[in-house]
Amino acid sequence: KELLDEKIFGIFQHHTIHRKTPLIRGFDDVFNAPHSRHSQIVREDVEKNPELTILADSEEAGPFIIIAKEGRQIFVTGHPEYDVLTLDGEYKRDLAKGMDNVPFPNRYYKDDKPELGPVKSWRCHANTLYTNWLNYYVYQMTTYDPMEIQNLK
């Protein structure tokens, strides 16, 4: 993880990798997701680790979904859980504080005009991500035999 000179802020395009992985089943080849952060995961560091696999990546925002240990660990670097107005609230809050260099949210407002409001372009993939996680990695992998729990470490 490394700190960035400029905040990654707004909606970024991602592409799927390892499409047969259940976590991204149903994803389009290219999809949008929100980011709001001052640091990043270094792609090359992830690729050097044989325990980690990048499932979705972005040229601009870096690795987005990383999976490890056959799905027992899942890392998401953006904010698919964000409501349509979350980035708007962050942007307006920082402007109201008079902060220097407040970044304009990338691909967030209709025609890049805040007065036209934001466009939520990530809802379907966010829902699919959480549905797949619950179905394939929580529900189907959860043992209901207390004696088996000790073997999951």
Tell me what each language-model feature is.
Residues P80-K153:
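Acyltransferase
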Residues E2-T86:
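Pocket-forming structural segment of enzyme catalytic cores
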